[in-house]
Amino acid sequence: MKTKLNRRGRRQRGYRGLLWVLAAGLLLFGLIAQQNILLGTSSRHALLMDARTGQVLARKRSGEEAAPASLTKMMTVLLATEALPDLDTPVTLPEDIFPALYKADASMAGFQPGETVTVRDLLYGAMLPSGAECCEALARQVSGSEEAFVALMNRKAGELGMKHTHFANCTGLTSPEHYSSAADLAVLLQAALNNETFRTVFTTGQYTSSVTAQHPKGLYMASTLLSRLDGGEVTGGQILGGKTGYTDAAGLCLASLAVVNGRVYSGHAGGTRKPRDGADQHHGCCAGVPQTGKEKMTGLRQFYR
């Protein structure tokens, strides 16, 4: 099993290397925020939003329905934070969820079958390393089954006005009945960031889980986005947090939050096939003065207080 997990981990790290390049380019568009810039990106669909006002600054096929990959986990984490306010509640990862996840080659945080962790551990495990086992465990804890939890996901999507979204699972694995759009994912993130627990998890770069028999030193986790960026600083600003995703059907996907010159932006992109273009966008679109971590957190507190 270790060989299989290590192989999966190497493949995931390769994808993550491509994703951070995409992030550096796409999410500081707010400095110029012009439609023709987005039209030139390799992302099939993208959207840039002022995260404070909700104003859409630029878009490209933002209403097109497409596979969201692991961006799905934003909804899973949001619902779990709403339903499970006691983050210290113990949860045992069901052994029966693992075979199907291994077979699907789903991304995993690294928890083991039968391991007992906390809700907090699972939230970070779902968001930072994109652990599918964490999503499945949270779904079971909230609703008793993934099917029942997915019904909650679709109900929440309807309440938020996500008209081009339908969920078929809580992890983002490819399914014909599992789709969303850049515009809908922007709406989801906008709503989720008003949840303090979600916001904290979304903007965290690294985390170590509670001690268990299987992990006597805890399980170290790093954000698939921020771990590739030195402190989140890129030319022109600071990436505060984000969620990456990849499947063959979805391509490279990203939802992220960045601050530039005191203004907070939400960026969403998917269907990207050419990581090189992300670097081109980074050099062509980013300018300004990078902010320190202190400025970043102060601005975020002011924005969401």
Q: Predicted segments — roles?
A:
Residues 40-45, 144-304:
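Penicillin-recognizing serine hydrolase domain
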Residues 30-183, 192-196, 260:
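Active-site-adjacent loops and short helices of periplasmic peptidoglycan-processing enzymes
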Residues 21-22, 27, 73, 282-285, ...:
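Generic low-polarity alpha-helical segments
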Residues 15-35:
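Sec-dependent N-terminal signal peptides of Gram-positive bacterial secreted proteins and lipoproteins
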Residues 5, 28, 297-300:
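Leucine-biased recognition of intrinsically disordered, low-complexity hydrophobic segments
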Residues 14-18, 59-62, 91-95, 103-107, ...:
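A generic short-segment signal for beta-strand/edge and adjacent turn/coil regions
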Residues 11, 33-34, 301:
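Intrinsically disordered, low-complexity regions enriched in polar/acidic and amide residues
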Residues 1-15:
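N-terminal Lys/Arg-rich, disordered targeting/topogenic segments
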